[in-house]
């Protein structure tokens, strides 16, 4: 299975745990893949606006277009209206999008 979508980063393209990401690279994680705060895997969303749910007050948010593959765990939060969120074993950072592109995609 392959999933395309988005992932949020801080202004230095680090995730909330301090791991740095770069364009055109593949990242992989070991262990069982499970979505959630106690889970394991790289989190991503198919809807760009859903990535903002996971941002911790970054001054300058960077959004990456990503491809997730390998083992994948899908999660839908029907109570809060968030759908198609994933934890993936392997994550490819296709590119980082500009703030202008991000706004256009969300309108």
Task: Give residue ranges: language-model regions.
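Short, glycine-biased loop/turn motifs at secondary-structure junctions and
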Residues: 1-107
């Amino acid at each position: 299975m392959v999933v395309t979508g988005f992932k949020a980063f801080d202004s230095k393209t680090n995730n909330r745990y301090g791991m740095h990401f770069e364009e055109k690279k593949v990242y992989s994680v070991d262990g069982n893949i499970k979505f959630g705060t106690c889970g394991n895997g790289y989190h991503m969303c198919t809807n760009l606006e859903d990535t903002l749910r996971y941002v911790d007050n970054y001054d300058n948010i960077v959004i990456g277009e990503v491809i997730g593959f390998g083992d994948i765990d899908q999660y839908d939060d029907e109570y809060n209206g968030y759908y198609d969120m994933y934890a993936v074993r392997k994550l490819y950072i296709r590119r980082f999008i500009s703030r202008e592109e991000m706004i256009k995609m969300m309108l």
